[in-house]
UniProtKB/Swiss-Prot annotation:
Residues 371-864 are annotated as: Interaction with NR3C1. Residues 107-177, 262-332 form the PAS domain. Ubiquitinated, leading to its proteasomal degradation. The gene is Clock. GO terms for cellular component: chromatoid body; CLOCK-BMAL transcription complex; cytosol; nucleus; transcription regulator complex. A motif (Nuclear localization signal) lies at residues 32-47. The lineage of its organism: Eukaryota, Metazoa, Chordata, Craniata, Vertebrata. This is Circadian locomoter output cycles protein kaput. Its EC number is 2.3.1.48. Residues 392-411, 420-494, 620-653, 755-803, 822-865 are annotated as: Disordered.
Length: 865
């Protein structure tokens, strides 16, 4: 008993120990799991923060168009920081340490302010006169762009009378520069002289004006300047010349006007597209000025409100601005020309304004004018003015700018053919110095003592040896057009000489490889343009030829240049044996071309064989035709045999192919006062019998059932076409007669008698010549009784063995040619079997009365035309 109790106690203790151990392990696992979760959260937070910082750093780096990985972002950041450190060290080395330089101004800002205060500009000249650098402030003083002066000779802008003096000043320092020492550069390198410099103009034809300038500076050795900066001249010196400049001396001078200007143009535009907004009254007074205006024009809003805008405009621009104002008041919106605006600092800035008139929302009256002013540079203004004058801007030379390659400015614009020809004519492209040499060589030499400030050129100066640009362009246009007109092929005649001349173009010694390759590119672009224009011209020629062909076909159809046959056949197996033409004078028959009828071509030899066969048909058609070229009257009669070997006679005046399309309407038109078509139900046995004629109006539709035979009279109005189109549902024979216009002397109504008979299939072909005589007599009797057509009886309708179509026309005493066309085409007997022939005729008669009731009108109500 005790043993069992002790065993139970021991087992309970063991179980308790096991459970405690298990609980401890579970708690330890929970703690580790919680630590792991918290560590993962902190790690994820750190990674997210790191990614955010990397992304922000990558967005600040330049050229971040594509997604960069972390290593690339860090590498670019390191490169940027290293470069920034070098630039900072260089700027600290060249920092102005004097006390008179304000600490809150950078070197560039201080230099710009000093140049504006001195009315001068910086000029760096080599001892041979080559200009390697010029500051942008030269624009406000001499109206030259820096690109006009850089890499040119200073003697191109100095009168010839002062060349020797300036050259002597520079050459003396050149001789002494062989033994350059730091002591010499500190003591004897001062340079000061005065001379005249050429003022720039928008129009080169204007008389040249010289300004009296003062040069103050010193000489500097280029090898003593840090190679990375060259004191700001790094981007200006060409790489091809940089090695030769390393051991030479340049003169850095401040060039000032001897007589300062009180008001001058702003020399630089930091942000050319900077803009501000203002509102004006209809009298052009300021009503509003936004917050962007004061940094640009210097005026605060309250300083200009109520004042007129014309108070701030240059006097030379007032006329153009007044015209722009009138245009605005007329059209309600527009864009102004380039004009000069006077700032508060007494400087002129160039602006261009987009404006529009706003209207009151209730009464729609003009309220005020909203203007958006944009700052533009003088280079844009000069280029626009020269384009208006028809002067092409000279291409800038291959000069390197700061942070850019040396050839970045030497891009050739190949937009138009004219510019390409202009470049090709001037190839090899002259350098800027040669252009300036020609510019200054035609100016007269003036005495500096006589005109201390400005020297206008003499008007008697001989003109330049070369023609102006617009005259050259006119000559090139005339020669170019004459060459293109005289050549057989547009493309080869223009492209081959140009390409061959470009291929054989020698490369001058002073011309860089880049310029030559650019000219070759221009020639290739010219070739592509000419080839494209050639393809366009050829396409236009083909299209015009196609349109002309269609017009000729329509004219032949409308004005009766030939007889056109339009055929509607119910059975596609219908064959035409031959076509016979008979005329009063067989010598007048010309060559005939094949006739295309519903996809089947009747060749000329078949027509001629039909002409020689001389078969006689069972029906005749009389047609009067007026000829535009013949002066004699010809009358011919034409007959065609119909049967298993059918023949059609056709008179044609043209040699073009006649096409027979399908139509489902019937049109009989002529310029006569009126025409009538009589369609009897069947041919009577003798012509003495009488029948009633049903007449219906012009605007009512004729409806014929399949296989139905009717007696109708159709009155039609004159229409300017000559075609008869037969519907497929009419069993009146498958012949379409086309006739041209008639003479205006035809005054009376004309009647067409159309008679149908169903051909007899069992009748042999040998009996047809025997039936010719009674049928001709029957036709003559019908022509005499045209006003009334006899109507056969029911027995005659059922016993009619043959069906044919006869069309007759009244002939008038007209001097024009008369053609007689007769054709007969039997219906296909395979449509109805012989055993059911009588039954089908009775069904046709039963449907006759119903169609007359629905479709035909009372003949008493119709007046013949």
């Amino acid at each position: 008993m005790l043993f069992t109790v002790s065993c139970s106690k021991m087992s309970s203790i063991v179980d308790r120990d096991d459970s405690s151990i298990f609980d401890g392990l579970v708690e330890e696992d929970d703690k580790n799991k919680a630590k792991r979760v918290s560590r993962n959260k902190s790690e994820k937070k750190r990674r997210d923060q790191f990614n955010v910082l990397i992304k922000e750093l990558g967005s600040m780096l330049p050229g971040n168009a594509r997604e960069m990985d972390k290593s690339t972002v860090l590498q670019k950041s390191i490169d940027f920081l290293r470069k920034h450190k070098e630039i900072t060290a260089q700027s600290d080395a060249s920092e102005i340490r004097q006390d008179w330089k304000p600490t809150f101004l950078s070197n560039e800002e201080f230099t710009q302010l000093m140049l504006e205060a001195l009315d001068g500009f910086f000029l760096a000249i080599m001892t041979d006169g080559s200009i390697i650098y010029v500051s942008e402030s030269v624009t406000s003083l001499l109206e030259h762009l820096p690109s006009d002066l850089v890499d040119q000779s200073v003697f191109n802008f100095i009168p010839e009378g002062e060349h020797s003096e300036v050259y002597k000043i520079l050459s003396t320092h050149l001789l002494e520069s062989d033994s350059l020492t730091p002591e010499y550069l500190k003591s004897k390198n001062q340079l000061e002289f005065c001379c005249h410099m050429l003022r720039g103009t928008i129009d080169p034809k204007e008389p040249s004006t010289y300004e009296y300038m003062r040069f103050i500076g010193n000489f500097k050795s280029l090898n003593s300047v840090p190679t990375s900066a060259h004191n700001g001249f790094e981007g200006t010196i060409q790489r091809t010349h940089r090695l030769s400049y390393e051991d030479r001396v340049c003169s850095v001078a401040t060039v000032r006007l001897a007589t300062p200007q009180f008001i001058k143009e702003m020399c630089t535009v930091e942000e050319p597209n900077e803009e501000f907004t203002s509102r004006h009254s209809l009298e052009w007074k300021f009503l509003f000025l936004d917050h962007r205006a004061p940094p640009i024009i210097g005026y605060l809003p309250f300083e200009v409100l109520g004042t007129s805008g014309y108070d701030y405009y240059h006097v030379d621009d007032l006329e153009n601005l007044a015209k722009c104002h009138e245009h605005l008041m007329q059209y309600g919106k527009g864009k102004s020309c380039y004009y000069r605006f006077l700032t508060k600092g007494q400087q002129w800035i160039w602006l261009q304004t987009h404006y529009y008139i706003t209207y009151h929302q209730w009464n729609s009256r003009p309220e005020f004018i909203v203007c958006t002013h944009t700052v533009v540079s003088y280079a844009e203004v000069r280029a626009e003015r020269r384009r208006e004058l028809g002067i092409e801007e000279s291409l800038p030379d291959a000069t390197a700018d700061k942070g850019q390659d040396s050839g970045s400015d030497n891009r050739i614009n190949t937009v138009s053919l004219k510019e390409a020809l202009e470049r090709f004519d001037h190839s090899p492209t002259p350098s800027a110095s040669s252009r300036s040499s020609r510019k200054s060589s035609h100016t007269a030499v003036s005495d500096p003592s006589s005109t201390p400030t400005k020297i206008p050129t003499d008007t008697s100066t001989p003109p330049r040896q070369h023609l102006p640009a617009h005259e050259k362009m006119a000559q090139r246009r005339s020669s170019f057009s004459s060459q293109s007109m005289n050549s057989q092929s547009v493309g080869p005649s223009l492209t081959q000489p140009v390409i061959s001349q470009a291929a054989n173009l020698p490369v001058p010694q002073g011309m860089s490889q880049f310029q030559f390759s650019a000219q070759l590119g221009a020639m290739q672009h010219l070739k592509d343009q000419l080839e494209q224009r050639t393809r366009m011209i050829e396409a236009n020629i083909h299209r015009q030829q196609e349109e002309l062909r269609k017009i000729q076909e329509q004219l032949q159809m409308v004005h009766g240049q030939g007889l056109q046959m339009f055929l509607q056949q119910s059975n596609p197996g219908l064959n035409f044996g031959s076509v016979q033409l008979s005329s009063g004078n067989s010598s007048n028959i010309q060559q005939l071309t094949p006739i295309n009828m519903q996809g089947q071509v009747v060749p000329t030899n078949q027509i001629q064989s039909g002409m020689n066969a001389g078969h006689i048909g069972t029906s005749q058609h009389l047609i009067q035709q007026q000829s535009l070229q013949s002066t004699s009257t010809q009358q011919s009669q034409q007959s065609v045999m119909s049967g298993h070997s059918q023949q059609t006679s056709l008179a044609s005046q043209t040699q073009s192919t006649l096409t027979a399309p399908l139509y489902n309407t019937m049109v009989i038109s002529q310029p006569a006062p009126g025409s009538m078509v009589q369609i009897p139900s069947s041919m009577p046995q003798n012509s003495t019998q009488s029948a009633t004629v049903t007449t219906f109006t012009q605007d009512r539709q004729i409806r014929f059932s399949q296989g139905q035979q009717l007696v109708t009279k159709l009155v039609t109005a004159p229409v300017a076409c000559g075609a008869v189109m037969v519907p497929s549902t009419m069993l009146m024979g498958q012949v379409v007669t086309a006739y041209p216009t008639f003479a205006t002397q035809q005054q009376q109504a004309q009647t067409l008698s159309v008679t149908q008979q169903q051909p007899q299939q069992q009748q042999p072909q040998q009996q047809q010549p025997q039936q010719q005589q009674p049928q001709q007599q029957q036709q003559s009797s019908q022509e005499q009784q045209l006003p009334s057509v006899p109507q056969p009886s029911q027995a005659q309708l059922t016993q009619s063995p043959q069906q044919f179509l006869q069309t007759s026309r009244l002939l008038h005493g007209n001097p024009s040619t008369q053609l007689i066309l007769s054709a007969a085409f039997p219906l296909q007997q395979s449509t109805f079997p012989p055993s059911h022939h009588q039954q089908h005729q009775s069904q046709q008669q039963q449907q006759l009365s119903r169609h007359r009731t629905d479709s035909l009108t009372d003949p008493s109500k119709v007046q013949p035309q």
